[in-house]
């Protein structure tokens, strides 16, 4: 049942008994043009009890067009009901009634009343006034498709040939005396419904004619989004963005995200009027910057790190924490690890982390906290500490390659802001551009442009995760409840984002800088001894950083790092020491070395002409990964070293060979069954073994001191007849591939 409202007949009687309206020139008698009304005589009145981000966005758009704005209710208690869920809003009329007493006799004054939290102004006062004068009204209300709050009143509305039929009270514009005559009739409770009040006045035919009340049926001035999302598109000019109503071919001046369309308004507000333009880029990005002053200590930060699932390259992640370009004595570290598998990694890094940051706290898997409970605990640590000025949440699958990330986000001066991160070469990111009706992922029209950084700026989005910064004051004043992440059965990050959105706090995302990337974790198999080795497909950039020699690119670029110790035998850096060690350890962990016999059941024919003590990559499940390494790194180097040859980098024989004095110390002269052969030393001569090396008999050229991680690349069959020289002490390991057999 709607809140009690005034009866139309009673209102009409009251209005007829009032003194006559001050003379107002009929709109039909006024000149029709942009200069029909002086913009200086326009006043925008709005209502806001708190300076929310929605309110600041409204003011920002008003200031862009030089509107004069008067705000009612700032700092006062809202008693107008929960208008987001039910009827209410009468308090707005009471405030407006009092304010309009100032303008009751100003017949040339035009007032536009709009909401503020969910409104954006899209064009100038001049255009607004021109359209108002052309309407021929004394008071023009916005229109929508829904007869709210009483559907039973729908049949009393005049028929409309084209356009929206029903009144919406979120925006109206009119001559000050007319508005005063309307709102002075309000004598109801603050939580009675304002829209019902205006509706009942409008529905009286005599009153409608007497006061020249009308609706903006075709959204020439007011665009209410509820029920009209399919009608609205963005219209891009070089330095301006408008919304266009394609149903009526109009360019509205006021955009109102009424009802459940707040997120769609946030999307439009990223562009309108100049949030982002094709020529100017981000129009508002630098207006709120808070540059951290030099010579003064920066804000105190709680860095909350979460290891919630087995995560590749975790030791590298922990080391990157030490590289943040922010004074470590201003950072306290909270680390939650739910994975027993990662306890050794954290134990190795913990002494450094303890020495680096001002305070540290570790919560391990023995606490049996859920991901939501751990996040609530960390966030509350900042909330309860008045000295905690910023809360920086960081998941272990977020790779921050930009050490200035924390500083950049703080200087953006937003309540909540995340750095844009995505998986390498993928569209998977740490934000959603839109939500589906059930509040799960939906792709916004600009999602790809944002992920690929074709549009750069600071964006208002409905969902962020994995890395974000929140003001400590925001936690203490606007998000005081402890259970933010564990308050529902949904994913903790979804629960957090919903809690923030419901408070009217914007979730900002910055893609102004390259901040880093996300790791893929779903196929991370910890059954391997060194599971990171298998990440060449899922996380190729991180895999390369960990396993490909730091000088490989320089060698490929022709910087003089490739050597030729024998004719057509090339020597170049390929693998890191870590990869060499982990390959050897994987082989020894597997342990099923061949016996170096001619009979070999692993081969199609069951016979090996030149046997070695070895383990094939297929045996340890690493064949596909090694072939990807050949395609990505060995193939380009081969074509660089042998101009005119194009390799398919196909190899069916990929294996690690072990040489020992008491097992198989050497290998007799032979040709390889390949177009070219790759031979990588996996350990150090003089440290791990003595002797060894390779001799090319045709040239009587030997390589007696192989370098760990460096690859020999040489032709196989026909020309490069060679032998493995005896290993005299220790154990020598090499990785061999017969390529393009």
From Swiss-Prot:
Its EC number is 1.14.11.4, 2.4.1.50, 2.4.1.66. It holds the Pfam family OGFOD2-like. Residues 298-523 are annotated as: Accessory region. Fe cation binds at residues 670, 672, 722. GO terms for molecular function: iron ion binding; L-ascorbic acid binding; procollagen galactosyltransferase activity; procollagen glucosyltransferase activity; procollagen-lysine 5-dioxygenase activity. One of its GO terms (biological process) is peptidyl-lysine hydroxylation. CDD domains: GT_LH3. Glycans are attached at residues 66, 286, 551. SUPFAM superfamilies: Nucleotide-diphospho-sugar transferases (SSF53448). It is found in: Rough endoplasmic reticulum; Endoplasmic reticulum lumen; Endoplasmic reticulum membrane; Secreted. Mn(2+) binds at residues 115, 118, 256. Its cofactor is Fe(2+); L-ascorbate; Mn(2+). Residues 28-293 are annotated as: Required for glycosyltransferase activity. The N-terminal domain mediates glycosyltransferase activity. The C-terminal domain that mediates lysyl hydroxylase activity is also important for homodimerization. This is Multifunctional procollagen lysine hydroxylase and glycosyltransferase LH3. The lineage of its organism: Eukaryota, Metazoa, Chordata, Craniata, Vertebrata. The gene is Plod3.
